[in-house]
């Protein structure tokens, strides 16, 4: 994986273990555009990186056995659990909640019941979030889970959240996202004191709406004050101005998709330029090694695996259209988070932040209008 890692401490169930000791990951074998073929091939790649891991592979038994027969490395770490159905990519979350025997639901059940410490699915995002909130449930002190992911920048990697789980947020949600993003960067990127920025329309303190200014005030007066950079703008995301960028799910999703589109456009334009004539083609031969390194660095498969943070277990969403290498990256994220006590880190941060209750109370005294919207 591209990420640096810290050493493990506690499992999601609270039992002490190290990364060398076995743990179980529940995997939705039927999710995603590629279905079991991509999932099992991805697990075969992940098996080389995590030989001590155990996977509870959930889905249609006959189909999964057929795929495992083609991938002995995956078969060596997998135990199949049959599921009678799969959640379609276009099913509404409310409908998905009623399908109790789906591969996605049984994967969540395995985490909730302590059989597995984490879950990975390439399936329906909305259904996955709804099931995670109902089945796995949120951590104490967290009002809403958020979707977080890692993206490349000019200075390394940045953690961004929320990327679509919560379209509308208040200042409390943004503060919680900052706590969870800081814990994510510590556990997954190995940063001892990640810097935090609130995404805004300008870096000046007076810019933005009331909820952004309230969240900034709370963070400036919290135990994260030394790490809080203040407001950041869109260009700061790729510049690597901060290690964590916090925003609401609507803005975060738009920023994410805009960045992905800009990257695709840049590669299309480069191809057009280097095919425009003989000299351009000769120039391509000279710069090809550097372009290949850049392509590898920016390969979205390396960063596949968005995480629903704030839940009572590790829940990782793989991109539905990824290939085996991309799915393996999502499995890497889940396995690394399980072994590196990610949720324990969030619990510690929540308690260290002078407690969220005290922060909220102080903010309401400072901003009387806050109580009215609480």
From Swiss-Prot:
It comes from the Bacteria. Pathway: Lipid metabolism; phospholipid metabolism. Homodimer. Probably interacts with PlsY. GO terms for biological process: fatty acid biosynthetic process; phospholipid biosynthetic process. Transmembrane segments: none annotated. Belongs to the PlsX family. Catalyzes the reversible formation of acyl-phosphate (acyl-PO(4)) from acyl-[acyl-carrier-protein] (acyl-ACP). This enzyme utilizes acyl-ACP as fatty acyl donor, but not acyl-CoA. Disulfide bonds: none annotated. Its main location: cytoplasm. GO terms for cellular component: cytoplasm. It catalyses: a fatty acyl-[ACP] + phosphate = an acyl phosphate + holo-[ACP]. This is Phosphate acyltransferase. It is an enzyme of class 2 (transferase). It is found in: Cytoplasm. Keywords: Cytoplasm, Lipid biosynthesis, Lipid metabolism, Phospholipid biosynthesis, Phospholipid metabolism, Transferase. InterPro entries: FA_synthesis, Phospholipid_synth_PlsX-like. Its EC number is 2.3.1.274. The keyword Transmembrane does not apply. GO terms for molecular function: phosphate:acyl-[acyl carrier protein] acyltransferase activity.
